[in-house]
């Protein structure tokens, strides 16, 4: 990575405005999944050890520029204190005189959590005045929120106009892993692209066709490709306006010598429920009033074999409706193949794929699970991320 990180700057006694991603799921004021808080710990601990005054900023939910009581970061600050084993202060605002007083009272190694930055309308507009207010609190800006790096907001990008800007350890790791995958991958390099819609994955498929040896597709988006081959797909998801594009992608794969894998059999159902009746049929035999909801057992074996023989696998998007038990086997099988593959480096591209490996208890068997769904997708499309571009070069 050619951007400066916290390892490249002197932090002792400095006020550090550190943008983290504490956007954790909450239920009735309780945190239901603290993965994102834990992911930020190495950076926070490093800043503390180096004697910085650590000012943490994050969003939580979508309050749309106003104060929403249940989206305050108070429970997050409390949990962070427990995880760090130290006293963590919490401000009621994200800038202003009261916050400046709290910062002025900080000693080296102290940690202060600011209030939800999206309580201010200027945050998502990347308002320069708000960015200046944030910058006034600190000497250095650290961006460790890879999950929000694709957003040009006041606390992720705008603030970098007024302070030296470096990455945290989590951001640095994300950029190193994803950057190497795209620029200098170990081969064979396989991408697994799933999820519901072709339109969400157009950019990533197009960009990866130039880089991968194998492209595997699954999930709802696969049926548009199946239809493009002239097969009937019953009531399965299909984007008719993307059929020509699907044909173009399959042709491009052929021209570039990329092995293009799509389902040969699928799990079909007549109803979406936990107790649904399912059948397994070949891909060209989906009846008119049935819907494809998962990849079938033959497909799972083929995909597992490709995975096993790959050196690098990037996975973005599930193979079926994994949230429901009868339609989860395909996604589980891909996760299992990655967990079992020896000598294969696995990169899970955030979002639903990350949720799936967590759900099936396979997370600790993956080499790298990205903390950013949208951010990792845009990175894999070859786009520049505003929260990265704004950091100082080495």
From Swiss-Prot:
Pathway assignment: Carbohydrate degradation; glycolysis; pyruvate from D-glyceraldehyde 3-phosphate: step 2/5
Binding site for substrate: 21-23, 36, 59-62, 118, 151
Localization per record: Cytoplasm
Entry-linked PROSITE patterns: PGLYCERATE_KINASE
Binding-site positions, ATP: 201, 292, 323, 350-353
UniProt modified residues of type Phosphothreonine: 299
Molecular function per GO: ADP binding; ATP binding; phosphoglycerate kinase activity
Gene3D superfamilies named in the record: Phosphoglycerate kinase, N-terminal domain
Entry EC no(s): 2.7.2.3
Phosphoserine modified-residue sites: 183
GO cellular component: cytosol
Principal location listed in the UniProt entry: cytoplasm
Catalytic activity of the protein: (2R)-3-phosphoglycerate + ATP = (2R)-3-phospho-glyceroyl phosphate + ADP
GO biological process: gluconeogenesis; glycolytic process
Top-level taxonomic group: Bacteria
InterPro entries per the UniProt record, alphabetical: Phosphoglycerate_kinase (IPR001576), Phosphoglycerate_kinase_CS (IPR015911), Phosphoglycerate_kinase_N (IPR015824), Phosphoglycerate_kinase_sf (IPR036043)
Keyword terms of this UniProt record: ATP-binding, Cytoplasm, Glycolysis, Kinase, Nucleotide-binding, Phosphoprotein, Transferase
HAMAP family with a match to the protein in the record: Phosphoglyc_kinase (MF_00145)
Similarity annotation: Belongs to the phosphoglycerate kinase family.
Subunit structure: Monomer.
Protein's recorded name: Phosphoglycerate kinase
Species this protein is from: Bacillus cereus (strain ATCC 10987 / NRS 248)
Taxonomic placement: Bacteria, Bacillati, Bacillota, Bacilli, Bacillales
């Amino acid at each position: 990575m050619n951007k400066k990180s916290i390892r490249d700057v002197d932090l002792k006694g400095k006020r550090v405005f550190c943008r983290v991603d504490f956007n954790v799921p909450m239920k009735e004021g309780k945190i239901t999944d603290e993965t994102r808080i834990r992911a930020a710990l190495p950076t926070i601990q490093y800043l503390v050890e180096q004697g910085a005054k650590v000012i943490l900023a994050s969003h939580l939910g979508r309050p749309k520029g106003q104060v929403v009581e249940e989206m305050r970061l108070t429970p997050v600050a409390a949990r962070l204190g427990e995880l760090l084993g130290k006293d963590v202060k919490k401000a009621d605002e994200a800038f202003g005189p009261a916050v400046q007083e709290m910062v002025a009272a900080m000693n080296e190694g102290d940690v202060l959590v600011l209030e939800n930055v999206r309580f201010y309308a200027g945050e998502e507009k990347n308002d320069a005045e708000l960015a200046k207010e944030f910058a006034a609190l600190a000497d250095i800006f650290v961006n460790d929120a890879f999950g929000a790096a694709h957003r040009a907001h006041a606390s992720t990008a705008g603030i970098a106009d007024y302070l030296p800007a470096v990455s945290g350890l989590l951001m640095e790791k994300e950029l190193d892993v994803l950057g190497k995958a795209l620029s200098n991958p170990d081969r064979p390099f396989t991408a697994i692209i799933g999820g519901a819609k072709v339109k969400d994955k157009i950019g990533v498929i197009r960009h990866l066709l130039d880089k991968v040896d194998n492209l595997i597709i699954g999930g709802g988006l696969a049926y548009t490709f199946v239809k493009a081959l002239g097969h009937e797909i019953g009531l399965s998801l299909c984007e008719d306006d993307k059929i020509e594009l699907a044909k173009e992608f399959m042709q491009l794969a052929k021209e570039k010598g990329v092995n293009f894998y799509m389902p040969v059999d699928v799990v079909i159902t007549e109803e979406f429920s936990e107790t649904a009746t399912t059948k397994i049929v070949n891909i060209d035999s989906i009846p008119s009033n049935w819907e494809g909801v998962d990849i079938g057992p033959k497909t799972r074996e083929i995909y597992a074999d490709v995975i096993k023989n790959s050196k690098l696998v990037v996975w973005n998007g599930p193979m079926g409706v994994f949230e429901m038990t009868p339609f989860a086997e395909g996604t589980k099988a891909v996760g299992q193949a990655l967990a079992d593959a020896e000598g294969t480096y696995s990169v899970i591209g955030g979002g639903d794929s990350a949720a799936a490996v967590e759900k099936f208890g396979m997370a600790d068997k993956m080499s790298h699970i990205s903390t950013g769904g949208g951010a990792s997708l845009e990175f894999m499309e070859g786009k520049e991320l505003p929260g990265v571009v704004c950091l100082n070069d080495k």
